[in-house]
Amino acid sequence: MIMDDVKATVLSILQDLTGEDVSNNMDANLFDEGILDSMGSVQLLLELQNQLGIEVPVSEFERSEWETPAKIVAKVASLQ
């Protein structure tokens, strides 16, 4: 999957989960902004697994690696 497809899928998942369009600010800290919380993180990981086949055990989830849309896209791309 090319990076643009990964980005579009991640942004779509984030919008579905949070109701927020974060595409305008790819460096926004989703946790500090109150857009994503721990439950949202689990839902995000499940959706990434369902839609992209990415498996990240919750025990290996490092919040600092997943805190912005840009970091999420990069992390997903690195796991494919």
From Swiss-Prot:
One of its GO terms (biological process) is cell wall organization. GO terms for cellular component: cytoplasm. Keywords: Cell wall biogenesis/degradation, Cytoplasm, Phosphopantetheine, Phosphoprotein. The modification O-(pantetheine 4'-phosphoryl)serine is found at S38. 4'-phosphopantetheine is transferred from CoA to a specific serine of apo-DCP. InterPro entries: ACP-like_sf, DltC, PP-bd_ACP. It comes from the Bacteria. It is found in: Cytoplasm. Pathway: Cell wall biogenesis; lipoteichoic acid biosynthesis. GO terms for molecular function: D-alanyl carrier activity. Belongs to the DltC family. NCBIfam families: dltC (TIGR01688), PRK05087.1 (NF003464). This is D-alanyl carrier protein 2.
